[in-house]
């Protein structure tokens, strides 16, 4: 029998992680039908991640800052975590050939292997990241950083947001995105402007179950650099919400390193839930994950592909 794994991030009303919930605090609905949880874990689960960094022309002034922020993510990876580093502009490259836990190797790639400036083939890059993760076990994550909108390769077949969102949902790949938008008129001095949002969940029974919520707000800021792009692509919070990841939009480069570290912390604080589906009909099923408790919000993937046996 197949177990459908669902990883959930639970936040309190104060925006902090809620780490100590028990199995009976969660409810998972498959196409609206409540499922019995056959898997529950609230200990740290290892991750396999493809980190994709925008090397487009608009990012040139910030290349070194992004590199340092990505190195911060590597520094807080745990021994069982594995990663590959990708960059996208004139081409999309991902190194090394195999996933590794070797921090020194990942630092070397960040310091010497990233390409020079070019366009921003955003959805193509995510598609390459999904392909890299296909045969990996456990929790599969893409972390992408960009300051701009998708700018596909001219004269070539390119992926759309719809293409990669569908594929990420079918292949159970969680997408986290960090967008840099220093030109935001609502910035008010820096820090996060907003995170992506999700639909609200209703109550259930005594005490209520909090449903999907928005993405965390965060770090204070100030300063920043002149605008380098109109704004990050509006598809980023959509694919993050659909896959159970997170979207963080920054208004200053000051918060880059802290945000990369924040993503790593969140990934290490997720709950692992699982259930055995009633039928494997080869169709996409809607998922809804809720947690009991006042003011709690849950982020988890919103669908899964009920692949038939064989």
Placement of each model-derived feature along the sequence:
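Scaffold/interface architecture of coatomer-like assemblies
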Residues: 1-310
């Amino acid at each position: 029998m197949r177990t459908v794994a669902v990883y959930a991030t639970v936040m309190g009303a104060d925006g902090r992680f809620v780490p100590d919930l028990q199995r009976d605090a969660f409810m998972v609905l498959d196409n609206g039908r409540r499922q019995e949880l056959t898997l529950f874990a609230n200990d740290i689960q290892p991750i396999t991640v493809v980190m994709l960094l925008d090397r487009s022309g608009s990012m040139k002034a910030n290349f070194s800052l992004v590199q340092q922020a990505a190195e911060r993510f590597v520094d807080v990876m745990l021994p069982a975590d594995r990663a590959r580093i990708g960059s996208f502009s004139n081409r999309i490259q991902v190194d090394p050939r195999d996933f590794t836990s070797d921090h020194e190797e990942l630092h070397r790639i960040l310091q010497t292997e990233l390409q020079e400036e070019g366009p921003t083939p955003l959805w193509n890059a995510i598609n390459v990241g999904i392909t890299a993760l296909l045969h990996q076990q456990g929790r599969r994550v893409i972390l992408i950083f960009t300051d701009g909108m998708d700018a596909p390769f001219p004269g070539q077949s390119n992926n759309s947001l719809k293409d990669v969102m569908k594929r990420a949902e079918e292949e159970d790949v969680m997408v986290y995105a960090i967008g840099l938008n220093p030109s935001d008129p609502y910035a008010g001095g820096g820090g996060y402007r907003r995170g992506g949002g999700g639909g609200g969940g209703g109550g259930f029974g005594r005490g209520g179950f909090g449903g999907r919520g928005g993405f965390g707000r965060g770090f204070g800021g100030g300063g920043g650099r002149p605008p380098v792009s109109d704004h990050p692509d509006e598809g980023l919070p959509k694919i993050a919400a659909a896959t159970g990841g997170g979207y963080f939009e920054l208004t200053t480069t000051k918060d880059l390193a802290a945000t990369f570290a924040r993503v790593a912390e969140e990934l290490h604080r997720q709950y692992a839930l699982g259930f055995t589906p009633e039928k494997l009909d080869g169709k996409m099923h809607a998922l809804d994950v809720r947690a009991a408790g006042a003011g709690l919000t849950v982020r988890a993937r919103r669908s899964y592909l009920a692949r038939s046996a064989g």
